[in-house]
Amino acid sequence: MKVNKESMLVYAITDRHWTGEKTLEQQVDEVLKNGATFLQIREKNMPHDELVKEAVLIKEIAKKYNVPVVIDDDIYAVIESGVDGVHIGQKDMDYIEARKLLGDDKIIGMTAPSVELAKKAEKLGADYIGAGAVFNTSTKKDTKYAPAIRHQPKRYLVSEKSIFNLREDYYSRFFQEK
């Protein structure tokens, strides 16, 4: 499954620490049932073998909704679980090596927190580009968010492959014209 404009409308990212009483699978099913069109499994502290098992279960749930699934950082978990692709950051495996391992049929998304890095990611062939956090976030302590993007978002949209991580309560403020 490849990325298209429709699949990038609502990009959901997992974090099992926020699921409350529900299992990760229950939470994923609910999110996809309610309209998420793309899913990233981002479980930073989950052991590799457990991540692969979770990814296999989540892949089956996503298949019901025809939603692509990528795993954050762990290319080998992608290969072992058979999910649709990987999302890599600037400090992860480089794009060329990732593409060699995954082949042309898998999705590779990249984080690019600047216009320069986004253009580089697009030139390399990334299927989509994430700008990262545009506001401070409690879910990613080491983030260097990009406040300039929130003041002129249209200026920073390098291409239709660009995405931003926005909480719902920030969305309307973010896209208001200045």
Where are these regions (language model features)?
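Active-site/ligand-binding-proximal alpha/beta "capping" segment
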Residues: 127-178
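Conserved N-terminal beta1-alpha1 strand-loop-helix module at the mouth
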Residues: 1-93, 100-127, 172
